[in-house]
Amino acid sequence: STKPEVTDNMILLVDIDEDFIQGVGGYPIPRSYYGHMIKRTNAIPGITVLMPDPDLRGLDEDWALANELEEIRTVLAFTASTQATEGGPHVGTAALGEDPRPWLFEYPGILRQLPVLADASSGVGLITTAPEIDGLVRRVPLVVNVGDNLYPTFALEMLRVGTGDPSYQIITKETGVEAIRIPSYPVISTDPHARVWTTWNTQFHRQSASDYLKEPVEGATFVIFGVTAEGVANPVPTPGGPKFAHEIQANLLHGLIAGDAPSEPVWAATAELAVAVIIILLLFVTATNVYFSAPIFLSAVGALIYGTWYYFGLGYLLDVTGTIFIAFLF
């Protein structure tokens, strides 16, 4: 990110690291420890660890966590799967306008949490990412389509549970998804596929799980737990370096709260095409006179760059590189 580094005081990251895992007897850790963790905070907790199968130590561990989930508003995670499944719990979503499903990322199934845990939680959200062509994660889908059901991302679910809203609204036009709205929260603009750009310039307060259980950092609104132990969790490449699942969701959640994550508006392609046509027509009219065509080309490039930064400041992301390239070739 080219933005200056900022510090987020609303989100605390808790790392389940090698030392903690060794101290509790190995991985996967007993589920009851997650129950102890979420009891230690007054914030909204979220756990990005997948727990699809019963605890190896017995069902008592699962029930210990489920009992705490019943008492404490907590968000759990699940991930998209290439294998068809029966799906999982999903929050009701009101579709305003066109059907959003043809525009959304679609998966055959999901790897869900153990039902006793998912049913006891206040929300379940996806931690699935969609890398760009260069392998880096820059944009994250806020909603995906699995079996014609709409599932929110983990960060969006954290925000919904934090605001106490029961559902979402997804606004779709003929050109794709335009925005997602939590009723008591400002509208979140997205690209046509319900993705938002994520900024990577945010520093979060973080603790190891061992230190957190002894004395948690106070003052956070959200606490997100994730595994960082080498050989257990694999970080995902991003423009800000490799990030673990809870780090990615924290950056996404920060952007949703701050409202500073730029999005590609649904009218972007139309606007870029219209500008390209206008510039080409101007260059065509002045093509026989370099004293006119050169200043027009340079002025157009300057205006495009200025316009891009202007709209970036408004939260819109426009890609004018193609327009400039076409004008240069002309």
Model-derived regions: residue spans:
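Non-transmembrane functional regions of envelope-associated proteins
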Residues: 1-186, 217-293
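A diffuse structural propensity rather than consistent per-protein peaks
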Residues: 30, 208, 319-320
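Short linear interaction motif-like sites in intrinsically disordered regions of transcription factors
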Residues: 64, 104, 198-201, 310
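Short, isolated positions within intrinsically disordered regulatory regions of eukaryotic proteins
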Residues: 67, 107, 201-204, 313
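Intrinsically disordered, low-complexity regions enriched in Ser/Pro/Gly/Gln/His and often acidic
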Residues: 96, 190-193, 302
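Intrinsically disordered regions, especially transient/low-confidence alpha-helical propensity segments
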Residues: 100, 194-197, 306
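Substrate-access "cap/lid" subdomains that shape
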Residues: 170-215
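Membrane-embedded alpha-helical segments, specifically the hydrophobic cores
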Residues: 298-330
